[in-house]
Structures are given as structure tokens and as C-alpha cells.
């Protein structure tokens, strides 16, 4: 029974739309800014780096907390612990409160990586920063850093590989429009 409670809690925790809440407090309707997405990247487009940093922190924190809670109930490397990691990302991407229209899961994935393996965090963050500063596309940085985390897991924590591969497929699915825009040269750069 407790595994189901942890699974539901992971999804619910992931579905808390922190970015939407904190921008609404500032009088901004995030759904009407930039891409309309509720992730930290779109919060950055509101012009407030502090609010964007807070959104990134909170979205990452929910991924970390979900895995931390799962670790209290399940063995490291267990199916149930990894299922909780996937469910928190699914909650962020498809929150029931927002008609299943949420963020893209990158910050939440960072949080689960922090809870699971610091080596993967280093690969993820290094690649994200390198690609972002080289090309100024947040979406490209997110996609390549996700691939880097999956590939790194194969070498540093193989039991995590299929979990991260699943999360990567979800992230690529949520970035579909960004991928099309990148291929067509229409993706918005950060200046």
C-alpha cells in the first residue's frame, strides 16, 4: 500500500505549478508570456532573473524531494524508487490541475538527478551551460543535456539508464515544437 501512496505523492508533488504560482503573485500570467509554457525558461522571459531562478529551484526541489521520499521507503536502484522519479516528472509535465498541460520537465529532472547521482548532475549542468552559451537556445541546451545524462548513466549508474531514457523520451516529446522550430530556424534565442 505504501508504494501507491509514494507514487501518488510523487505525481502530486510534481504537479505543483510553482512557476505559475510565483509569477501570478507578481501579477504576471505566465500562460500569456513567451511560449506560454510554465517552466523556468519561460519565467526568464518575463524579465526577472530572480523569479526565474526561484522557479528553477522550486521545480528542481520537487524532483529531489520526491526521490528523497521514495528512498525512505524503497531500496536504492529499485523499480519503485525509479518509478517515483518518473512520476514526479510526469506530474510536472501533465498536472491534473492544469488540464494536463504543464512544463517540459527539465528542472524537475535536474532535481531527480541531484537525489540519485551527483556525477550525472555534473554532466547535465556542464552540457546545458556549454550548449546554452554557445548557441543561446534553452531548448537545445535542455535536449543535449538530457542526452548527456542518459549516456552518462550508462557509464556511472547503469541501473538508472532506462529510467533516464524514459524521462528523456518524455522531455523530447514535450519539446516537439521546439525541435521543429530548431530544424526550421525559427526557435527563439535568448539575448
Swiss-Prot record:
Keywords carried by this UniProt record: Cell membrane, Lipid biosynthesis, Lipid metabolism, Membrane, Phospholipid biosynthesis, Phospholipid metabolism, Transferase, Transmembrane, Transmembrane helix
A biological process term (GO) from this entry: phospholipid biosynthetic process
Major localisation: membrane
Keyword Signal: no
Pfam families tied to this protein: G3P_acyltransf
EC numbers: 2.3.1.275
Membrane topology: Multi-pass membrane protein
GO molecular function, one term: acyl-phosphate glycerol-3-phosphate acyltransferase activity
Subcellular location, record wording: Cell membrane
Transmembrane segments: 5-25, 50-70, 78-98, 112-132, 153-173
Pathway: Lipid metabolism; phospholipid metabolism
Reactions catalysed according to its record: an acyl phosphate + sn-glycerol 3-phosphate = a 1-acyl-sn-glycero-3-phosphate + phosphate
Domain of life from the UniProt record: Bacteria
Record's function text: Catalyzes the transfer of an acyl group from acyl-phosphate (acyl-PO(4)) to glycerol-3-phosphate (G3P) to form lysophosphatidic acid (LPA). This enzyme utilizes acyl-phosphate as fatty acyl donor, but not acyl-CoA or acyl-ACP.
Entry's family note: Belongs to the PlsY family.
PANTHER family reported for this sequence: GLYCEROL-3-PHOSPHATE ACYLTRANSFERASE-RELATED, INNER MEMBRANE PROTEIN YGIH
Quaternary context: Probably interacts with PlsX.
Protein name as it appears in the record: Glycerol-3-phosphate acyltransferase
Amino acid at each position: 500500500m505504501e508504494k501507491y501512496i509514494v507514487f501518488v505523492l510523487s505525481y502530486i508533488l510534481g504537479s505543483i505549478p510553482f512557476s505559475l504560482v510565483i509569477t501570478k503573485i507578481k501579477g504576471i500570467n505566465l500562460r500569456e508570456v513567451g511560449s506560454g509554457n510554465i517552466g523556468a525558461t519561460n519565467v526568464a522571459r518575463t524579465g526577472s532573473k530572480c523569479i526565474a531562478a526561484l522557479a528553477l529551484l522550486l521545480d528542481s526541489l520537487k524532483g529531489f524531494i520526491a526521490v528523497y521520499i521514495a528512498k525512505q521507503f524503497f531500496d536504492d536502484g529499485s523499480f519503485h524508487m525509479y518509478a517515483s522519479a518518473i512520476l514526479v516528472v510526469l506530474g510536472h509535465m501533465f498536472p491534473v490541475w492544469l488540464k494536463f498541460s504543464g512544463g517540459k520537465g527539465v528542472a524537475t529532472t535536474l532535481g531527480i538527478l541531484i537525489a540519485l547521482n551527483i556525477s550525472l548532475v555534473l554532466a547535465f549542468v556542464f552540457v546545458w551551460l556549454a550548449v546554452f552559451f554557445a548557441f543561446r537556445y534553452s531548448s537545445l541546451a535542455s535536449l543535449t543535456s538530457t542526452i548527456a545524462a542518459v549516456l552518462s548513466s550508462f557509464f556511472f549508474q547503469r541501473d538508472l539508464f532506462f529510467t533516464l531514457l524514459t524521462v528523456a523520451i518524455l522531455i523530447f516529446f514535450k519539446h516537439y515544437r521546439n525541435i521543429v522550430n530548431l530544424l526550421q530556424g525559427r526557435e527563439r534565442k535568448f539575448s
